[in-house]
Amino acid sequence: MDKLIITGGVRLDGEIRISGAKNSALPILAATLLADGPVTVQNLPHLHDITTMIELFGRMGIEPVIDEKLSVEIDPRTIKTLVAPYELVKTMRASILVLGPMVARFGEAEVALPGGCAIGSRPVDLHIRGLEAMGAIIDVEGGYIKAKAPEGGLRGANFFFDTVSVTGTENIMMAASLANGRSVLQNAAREPEVVDLANFLIAMGAKIHGAGTDTITIDGVKRLGPATYKVMPDRIETGTYLVAAAVTGGRVKVKDTDPTILEAVLLKLQEAGAEVTTGEDWIELNMHGKRPKAVNVRTAPYPAFPTDMQAQFISLNAIAEGTGAVIETIFENRFMHVYEMHRMGAQIQVEGNTAIVTGTEVLKGAPVMATDLRASASLVISALVAQGDTLIDRIYHIDRGYECIEEKLQMLGAKIRRVPG
């Protein structure tokens, strides 16, 4: 199992390119199953979950054609089986996204419940209830969701999401694209990745209005045709490198990104004392060697501050001037990284869903363990500014969401290397 060794104390300085968004690429790949001809998806990030989704298509009898730039062509007409097996989907919650497209396009689907995913405790039940509202007959047995469309296909429906669910919104929107009649999704997720998926579906011929608002209207069509589409840039990767620059007092320009989808994060970085300038597809952050000021953060659904940037801002507050409160309103158990940061000397107190962070001038390198994707990014950021060496274990979590993280940080001057376990 690989590890990262980081020697802190270097101010980041330079330019990097941002990868395509994983959370956009996965639903877009799932949506290719709706097409009745070949579809090309460009700007895919080189990540484990993307590879798993492409491997899943291979198991179904589809033979994706991938080029060296990680553009993939998929022709779903060659599909031979409508089963997404457990051994593939157990590591990837996004596998549930093939459920809606398969039922809508082929009339049935059998998808293993993603690993550790209990019905009711996570919003898988919203996916099921949404499809049932469209007439699908669904059984959950033996760890699989087995779904069939009614005779004549799925029917348009009005559906209200009890809680805002990004993947739930995406799944039902995809299914509704080929349903008979009109569907209206209320309390829908407004994330940019939902809009990106809607734009891809529209490129294939779907009739969708209101993506990016909490009410999405879909008029079902008879067929969706071939298309070529470029995945949007990753806003969380963008934010992570900007925070890394801020924490080290450095200057970073991130290219091939979109400042308009990151406004809540950019405002907080400016509040922390960063000079932020933007262009159409780039953002530059410059701390001019200064130590950041602590900021208060409260996570909430888009367009508010994203939960996936919460851990990175705890790292920022840990070395900032003053005290900042970070309130997590989206997920439980999202402060696992705090206990690893204590090993580096961070002064953080957790009270319920709030982390109160008192900045300290110095963090010390230590052996730490990544616990999940975004928590692992916060440990990397803290290590960049810590005195001495930090050894980060279980970095497969990082590899799930960050393409070539050590190479990109090396381009910015960081002393970081990957070592085999």
Swiss-Prot record:
One of its GO terms (cellular component) is cytoplasm. Pathway: Cell wall biogenesis; peptidoglycan biosynthesis. Phosphoenolpyruvate binds at K22, N23. Its EC number is 2.5.1.7. The modification 2-(S-cysteinyl)pyruvic acid O-phosphothioketal is found at C117. Belongs to the EPSP synthase family. MurA subfamily. This is UDP-N-acetylglucosamine 1-carboxyvinyltransferase.
